[in-house]
């Protein structure tokens, strides 16, 4: 499995805004897209190509509507989905906010029966109100070293 993911857990009540994910599968249920509206770390509203299945997933337990992981995909040679999450979560210029259980190595207190890595490719990303990534490229001086031209060696 290739390297190329930088992850942590968001502060449990800090996620606000909306995100639209690319195609995904969860326990055999296909989704062409998933769009979530989030306030204070909790999914408030959603839309997807399979709303019935998404509602069932989100209603698994209280933690299923919260996020257990946030990650940037950094592998410069993976540039499109392969429909295998162990590769897709590493697509350069992607990020994922994972619904459900956190990771033990980066706990935020969220527990759930689910851990669903949903990948979003090419989104603008803001942290603490500052835009740090535009599309697939980091734009702040302290993060530009994570762009492909800095990672690939001839």
Model-found features: residue ranges?
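Metal/cofactor-centered catalytic core regions of large enzymes
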Residues: 1-154
